[in-house]
């Protein structure tokens, strides 16, 4: 284990009151690990305490993995992630805490500053639109990703290019580089200088603690393909999020149950949510069965169902909510987050709450 990870374990153990009384007998695995992988004098004591106090099964699996792999921690990331989940220190836990800290509700800009429309000066899903949402007071943005012909995620809502760009055809039938040659249209149908964003570009403009809600799309019948794989895209998306280090401010969501199942299988510590156009008890039950962190229902969800979801340990982020009156209704229901085309209206309304 690295000095950083072992040091963090020691700090946690001291915080929890471990290491202050008579020491526990040294665990054989602690002896084996410390002899091979650490020169810290207190290593055996810290590892023994961790093995017996802090998520012992997950901790043992991690130390055993590192020891068995000649102290190469990089080969034990799954075991470390499982331990973080057990400890409540996974990215999903930090997202949950951040959302709860934004009460009475988090303000998430839908496709940035809203859908492409004559009244919206920015194209939907554009870097300018995402930037505008944050400037308007949004706590984060909601966006959609589709899969390209070379199995890469790209930011666009539709599975075709016709409505929002100067290109035509299915997104999944063009490569990432080909799609980057397309330009987004404004609400009047004029060609802008805005490209379809890469995910890293969005995180660059939506920076700091701002949240990014990624809805993972699956293509419709008109764009069905045997050459591209949703599973491949999801795995690449998850790897990309991990590589750039933004999981602690990322919400992953999908209408497709197989997608959110895959997310939890590949990254159980990431925050994910099941979307539904039909709110109700069945959605809540299914989200719990799928070990989701939240539901993303339409705003028609009842106050009783919001409370039932919260009682079940789920957060509730509703969509797409426009107009101050409808926004206030969602706040009164107790929802966790509101996805809106009008982040500036919601930002002002939230400042007026008691």
Which residue ranges define each predicted feature?
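Sec-dependent signal peptide recognition
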Residues: 2-12
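Phosphate-group recognition and catalysis centered on beta-loop-alpha active-site segments
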Residues: 20, 88-354
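Mature extracellular/luminal domains of secreted and GPI-anchored eukaryotic proteins, especially small
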Residues: 19-91
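C-terminal motif of bacterial Sec signal peptides marking the signal peptidase cleavage site
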Residues: 15-17
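Alpha-helix initiation and N-capping motif
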Residues: 5-6, 59, 173-176
């Amino acid at each position: 284990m690295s000095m950083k990870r072992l040091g963090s374990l020691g700090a946690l153990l001291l915080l929890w009151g471990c290491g202050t009384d008579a020491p526990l007998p040294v665990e054989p695995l602690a002896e084996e690990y410390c002899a091979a992988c650490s020169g810290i004098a207190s290593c055996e004591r810290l590892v023994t305490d961790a093995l017996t106090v802090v998520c012992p099964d997950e901790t043992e699996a991690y130390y055993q993995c590192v020891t068995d792999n000649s102290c190469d921690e990089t080969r034990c990331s799954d075991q470390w992630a499982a331990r973080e989940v057990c400890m409540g220190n996974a990215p999903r836990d930090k997202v949950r805490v951040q959302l709860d800290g934004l009460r009475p509700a988090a303000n998430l800009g839908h496709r940035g500053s809203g859908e492409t429309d004559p009244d919206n000066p920015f194209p939907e899903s554009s870097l300018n639109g995402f930037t505008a949402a944050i400037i308007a007071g949004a706590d984060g943005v909601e966006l959609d990703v589709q899969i390209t012909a070379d199995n890469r995620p790209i930011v666009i809502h539709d599975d075709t290019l016709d409505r929002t760009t100067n290109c035509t055809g299915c997104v999944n039938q063009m490569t990432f580089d080909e799609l980057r040659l397309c330009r987004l249209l404004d609400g009047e149908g004029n060609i802008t200088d805005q490209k379809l964003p890469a995910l890293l570009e969005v995180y660059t403009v939506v920076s700091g603690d701002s949240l990014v809600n990624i809805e993972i799309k699956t293509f419709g019948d008109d764009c069905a393909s045997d050459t591209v794989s949703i599973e491949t895209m999801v795995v690449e998306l998850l790897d990309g999020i991990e590589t750039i280090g933004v999981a602690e401010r990322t919400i992953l969501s999908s209408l497709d149950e197989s997608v959110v199942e895959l997310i939890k299988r590949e990254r159980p510590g990431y925050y994910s949510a099941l979307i539904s156009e039909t709110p109700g008890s069945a959605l809540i039950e299914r989200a719990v069965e799928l070990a989701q962190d939240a539901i993303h229902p339409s705003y028609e969800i009842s106050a009783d169902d919001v409370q039932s979801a919260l009682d079940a340990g789920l957060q509730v982020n509703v969509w797409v909510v426009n107009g101050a009156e409808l926004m206030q209704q969602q706040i009164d229901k107790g929802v966790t987050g509101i996805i809106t085309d009008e982040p500036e209206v919601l930002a002002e309304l939230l400042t007026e709450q008691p």
